[in-house]
Amino acid sequence: MEEGITLATLDSHDCPVGSRMTSFISSDGPPGIEISLTKADSLEHGLRGLESGDIDVLAIPAGMIHGNMLGVLQAGCKIVGARTPVRPYPVLVSENKLQYQPKSAILLCESKLGRRQLRRARRGIRVLSPEAYADIEGRADTPSDPISLTKWMEELRESGDIDGFVVARGLYDKCQLVTRRHSLLPDGLNEGDPHFIPPAYSDLIVFVARSRFPKSISDEISEKEGETAWWVQNNFVGSLDAKS
């Protein structure tokens, strides 16, 4: 058994990093190292912990790294691995599948990519962002917190004002919704089902460590599929940023 490490986790509303790492350590059998888990309050807090040596690795949703890589590098750190996404696909929260929505249906979706895919898959229905819907209906500003926004949309669905909405699976679970959900998958379960691409970095966890962190240790917690997902998505999104 190698010397143990301290791994800090940082959750987002749609990526439960802490529970994922706890499950990995407990159910997959102990890796070749002893891992002690702790929590970070923010990316900045985690980077300070790495700089001071209080922690050895920071596990964080990949989406939090986007736009913050310079800060990671300035802290003398780098991405040393990633975990394969478990549930990256968003869900449609509605009594009906997308194909069976009435022609007058109103669906809400925050993601611009998601709205485009919904309109392509089911022409004729109204697919709006929560902000656009609130503006059209003359309602108060939408909640800024993802959990509050999800609950707000569920209240609209329950009252019959809308027919459904799309959220990350992690948000659905965190809000403890019991309404029927329909996963928007890249390959439909049944013939004729529409195909959807999940948003970049969905449910993807990356590991941040100091620049000279031993590869033999990062290999114990990282997965090749996760590393590939990170490399592909980060390079793709980075190329879009460079063109904008």
Task: Go through each PLM region and give its residues.
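Small-molecule-sensing regulatory modules
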Residues: M1-S52, R115-R116, R120-S244
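Flexible hinge/capping segments at coil-to-helix
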Residues: P90-L107, A121, I125
